[in-house]
């Protein structure tokens, strides 16, 4: 296991020990990380990864911790948050953003540069790295539609660039997930557009989001993938599960596809409620819901 002394001389690296991950997740749940690291440069990330590998220390990389549940026992080893790697560069019709850049900010950069095609992501509460990891999408748009290439690092510290076809995108899936790669940055190809029209479309999508989703409570976003031929929220409604509560977590009364932390809930509450919803929806409709949210850590 990596020691504190192994990390002291890595420049541009902020370290916290036994840090509650509930301070960083959108659900406001999650036990402690043994070591929580915030690299501010690719070099710091590379050196940290190399030292973790040399000491057989497990590494977990989190995006913006939005579509994520960290269990109450926390995460052993090193947890890396990439929020300090957040640069965004524009060249012509191309935007290149580091993994820690927030989707909302990248869409604002696109609008300011009269670039259209990224509006669908304006309200997704995630980072570029997390969005690429799971091929995030909303309102008919998905990351795969605009991504050109992605710079990644493997567990050995090797950096490579994957083309869009090499990313093997699927519904809420990419090769990043399969091969345990770290997204460093992503390049997107957009089109020329009118900045006023782009802003109007973003305003429209944000209004839809705010009117239909329970943004006033901590949540992990959409809990379940969309089953073929159905909508998860509708199936949950039909099973009369809206308002169903376990501990401090309940199925949102505003949008059945969300589970909200209404009263200091924990990850165990989330997992129990997810299991209950899967069971009851299966009984009612015959459809087996599959979680979209990523659940990690120790119980």
Swiss-Prot record:
Its EC number is 1.3.1.98. It catalyses: UDP-N-acetyl-alpha-D-muramate + NADP(+) = UDP-N-acetyl-3-O-(1-carboxyvinyl)-alpha-D-glucosamine + NADPH + H(+). Coiled coil: none annotated. Residues 28-193 form the FAD-binding PCMH-type domain. GO terms for molecular function: FAD binding; UDP-N-acetylmuramate dehydrogenase activity. Pathway: Cell wall biogenesis; peptidoglycan biosynthesis. It is an enzyme of class 1 (oxidoreductase). It is found in: Cytoplasm. It holds the Pfam family MurB_C. PROSITE patterns: FAD_PCMH. Keywords: Cell cycle, Cell division, Cell shape, Cell wall biogenesis/degradation, Cytoplasm, FAD, Flavoprotein, NADP, Oxidoreductase, Peptidoglycan synthesis. Belongs to the MurB family. GO terms for cellular component: cytosol. SUPFAM superfamilies: FAD-binding/transporter-associated domain-like (SSF56176), Uridine diphospho-N-Acetylenolpyruvylglucosamine reductase, MurB, C-terminal domain (SSF56194). Its cofactor is FAD. GO terms for biological process: cell division; cell wall organization; peptidoglycan biosynthetic process; regulation of cell shape. Cell wall formation. InterPro entries: FAD-bd_PCMH (IPR016166), FAD-bd_PCMH-like_sf (IPR036318), FAD-bd_PCMH_sub1 (IPR016167), FAD-bd_PCMH_sub2 (IPR016169), MurB (IPR003170), MurB_C (IPR011601), MurB_C_sf (IPR036635), Oxid_FAD_bind_N (IPR006094). It comes from Lactococcus lactis subsp. cremoris (strain SK11). The keyword Cell cycle applies. The active site is at 172, 222 (proton donor), 292. The keyword Ligase does not apply. This is UDP-N-acetylenolpyruvoylglucosamine reductase.
């Amino acid at each position: 296991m990596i020691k504190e002394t192994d990390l002291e001389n890595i420049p541009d690296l902020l370290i916290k020990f036994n840090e509650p991950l509930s301070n960083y997740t959108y659900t406001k749940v999650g036990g402690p990380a043994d070591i929580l690291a915030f690299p501010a440069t690719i070099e710091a990330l590379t050196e940290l990864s190399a030292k973790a590998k040399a000491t057989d220390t497990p590494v977990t990389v989190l995006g913006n911790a939005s579509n994520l549940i960290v269990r109450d026992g926390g995460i052993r080893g090193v947890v890396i948050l990439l929020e300090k790697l957040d640069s965004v560069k524009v060249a012509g019709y191309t935007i290149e953003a580091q993994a820690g850049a927030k989707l909302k900010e990248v869409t604002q950069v696109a609008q300011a540069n009269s670039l259209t095609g990224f509006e669908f992501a304006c309200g997704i509460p995630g980072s570029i790295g997390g969005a690429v990891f799971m091929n995030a999408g909303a309102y008919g748009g998905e990351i795969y539609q605009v991504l050109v290439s992605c710079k990644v690092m493997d567990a050995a510290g090797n950096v490579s660039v994957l083309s869009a076809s090499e990313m093997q995108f699927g519904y809420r899936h990419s090769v990043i997930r399969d091969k345990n790669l770290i997204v460093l940055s992503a390049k997107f190809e957009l089109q020329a557009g009118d900045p006023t029209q782009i802003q109007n479309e973003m305003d429209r999508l944000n209004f839809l989001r705010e009117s239909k989703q329970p943004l006033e409570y901590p949540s992990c976003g959409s809990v379940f993938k969309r089953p073929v031929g159905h909508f998860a929220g509708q199936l949950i409604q039909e099973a009369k599960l809206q308002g169903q509560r376990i501990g401090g977590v309940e199925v949102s009364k505003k949008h059945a596809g969300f589970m909200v932390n209404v009263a200091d809930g924990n990850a165990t509450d989330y997992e129990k409620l997810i299991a209950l919803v899967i069971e009851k929806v299966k009984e009612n409709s015959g459809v087996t819901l599959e979680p979209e949210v990523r659940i990690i850590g120790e119980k």
